[in-house]
Amino acid sequence: NVALSELPDFSCLPGRERAEHHTAGIILAPSLRYMEQAFFDARQHGWSQQPIVEMLIPSTLDDSLAPKGAHVASLFCQHVAPELPGGKAWPEHRDEVAKLMIDTVNRYAPNFKASVLGYRALSPFDLEQEFGLIGGDIFHGALSLNQLFSARPVLGHGNYRMPLKGLYLCGSGAHPGGGVSGLPGHNAAREVLKGRD
């Protein structure tokens, strides 16, 4: 999470005034090859030296999140290992990776680094310690073949209803999983309403 003195001025869409692209999700990954390399680099080293950065600037949609003229942004990178190789630990490398992500954004928006007022970085270790997300997994379980569709979160419980009457699952651990904003909640709410008939 980054506090900014101004909006990013992207080289491909110049301008520091709020524009449509500032209000959308932004993925900084110039090619499929870049994305593939980021994945393999992270598997070998724990994080990619050329990371894929997903960026949101929620203050463009809700001006109560930052003082007038300032903004907040969220930078997210999926390709980081929960456990670092070679005995390295996340608390010692958290800021290094955060600065790498800021530098990555700066390649696409040259005013970005200078506009950073402050930041708070969360590594996979921090996500587990603070929020209980095992291994820093924001999807509450791998999006693997054995945990998709009717098998999410596990086979037999893909209908959002849990074994306890009146208990429904509606987060990233439910179908279709994390990254599909709002759908697990929408689908669970539909099941709740069905149960009221």
Regions found by a protein language model. Give the residues of each.
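Mid-domain catalytic core of redox enzymes
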Residues: N1-A66
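Flexible loop/turn segments at secondary-structure boundaries
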Residues: P8-S11, L61-S64, A81-L84, P124-D126, ...
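Conserved FAD/dinucleotide-binding core of flavoprotein oxidoreductases
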Residues: A3-S5, G15, H22-L28, P67-L100
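C-terminal structured subdomain/cap of oxidoreductase catalytic cores
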Residues: A3-D9, A70-V72, A89-M101, F139-D197
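A glycine-rich dinucleotide-binding beta-alpha-beta segment and adjacent secondary-structure elements
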Residues: S48-L56, R107-H175
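Flavin-binding catalytic cores
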Residues: L7-P8, I27, Y34-E36, F40-Q50, ...
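A generic secondary-structure boundary signal that marks alpha-helix termini
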Residues: L84, P110, K194-D197
